[in-house]
């Protein structure tokens, strides 16, 4: 699952623990851990990934993909 690496990278950029991200996304810790381990999401639970994505985007994370299909994340930092 491509999301797993992006979620781990985004969390690292923010300096968040799995517990912090799970809380901000409104998910159980075990659910987030399963997704980060690349064990996938249960059928019909794509909404779980959307919750994670929204929590990360609200913190300034952008999910990116280039025209070669490579994926990644970047973080927007406000200038002072």
Over which residues does each language-model region extend?
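A detector for short, charged/polar N-terminal pre-domain segments
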Residues: 1-2
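Short, charge-rich, low-complexity interaction segments located
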Residues: 36-49
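Short basic helix-loop element that most often maps to the first helix and adjoining turn
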Residues: 7-20
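Helix-turn-helix/homeodomain-like alpha-helical modules used for DNA recognition
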Residues: 61-80
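DNA major-groove recognition helix of helix-turn-helix/homeodomain DNA-binding modules
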Residues: 46-63
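Residue-level detection of the helix-turn-helix DNA-binding "recognition helix"
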Residues: 12, 26, 37
């Amino acid at each position: 699952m491509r999301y797993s690496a992006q979620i781990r990278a985004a969390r690292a950029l923010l300096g968040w623990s799995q517990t912090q991200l799970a809380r901000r996304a409104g998910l159980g810790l075990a659910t987030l851990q399963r997704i980060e381990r690349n064990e996938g999401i249960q059928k019909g639970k794509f909404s779980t990934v959307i919750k994670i994505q929204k929590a990360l985007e609200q913190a300034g994370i952008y999910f990116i993909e280039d025209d070669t299909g490579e994926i990644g994340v970047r973080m927007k930092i406000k200038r002072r």
